[in-house]
A protein has these predicted regions:
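Glycine-rich hexapeptide-repeat left-handed beta-helix
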Residues: 2-19, 53, 59-61, 67-68, ...
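N-terminal segments that cap or nucleate solenoid repeat domains
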Residues: 2-44
């Protein structure tokens, strides 16, 4: 009989549930474990860890998860990352929801229950505390994180849209050079 966690989930977890679109681009040195879903053209770079033990992690189409990123859910708190997003080096996302077309800065931390609106930028090193919610189209900075100001359409294009497009092109080149790989239709990362 399975032991029960303090939050009521079983310790018998199926860690072979990763689902990746065949167009995803994956580094052989990343870690994908548990209930993780990668959309079309998602790139997961070296040293990143996505671990879905008790709730799902969903990374929607055309996201770039850069080197050293940690993404983990919590009991009843899935991680959902909207399409066309850049998650910067060494960022940590835990039990949060990120809107589409955002830039998540290097070494920032986004905690359980936090929500980031679409077309937003979370500055490098920011700490988004538990349960904090931010609207669409804002610059989020500091420890603890606060809205600095609204972003202009030009800033959204320069900081969110264009970098995401550039990373898609870079990961396509890495795929062609064998640095990244596409998963097979019967992909089982832990096999």
């Amino acid at each position: 009989m399975a032991e029960e966690h303090a939050h009521g989930s079983s310790t018998e977890i199926d860690y072979h549930r990763v689902k990746a679109d065949p167009t995803a681009r994956i580094s052989p040195s990343c870690s994908l474990v548990g209930d993780v879903t990668l959309g079309k053209k998602v790139a997961v770079m070296a040293g990143s860890c996505l671990r879905g033990d008790d709730a799902p992690i969903v990374v929607e189409d055309e996201c770039n998860i850069q080197e050293g990123v940690v993404i983990h859910e919590d009991y009843g708190k899935p991680v959902v990352i909207g399409r066309h997003k850049t998650v910067g080096h060494r960022a940590m996302l835990h039990g949060c929801v990120i809107g589409e077309n955002c830039l998540i800065g290097m070494s920032c931390t986004i905690m359980n229950g936090a929500k980031i609106g679409k077309n937003s930028v979370v500055a490098a090193g920011a700490l988004v505390t538990e349960g904090k919610e931010f609207p669409d189209g804002v610059l989020i900075v500091g420890v603890p994180a606060k809205v600095r100001r609204e972003l202009t359409e030009e800033e959204i294009a320069d900081m969110c849209t264009f970098p995401g497009d550039d990373y898609l092109k870079q990961t396509e080149a890495m795929l062609k050079d064998g640095v990244l790989f596409n998963p097979a239709p019967d992909f089982d990362f832990q096999a």
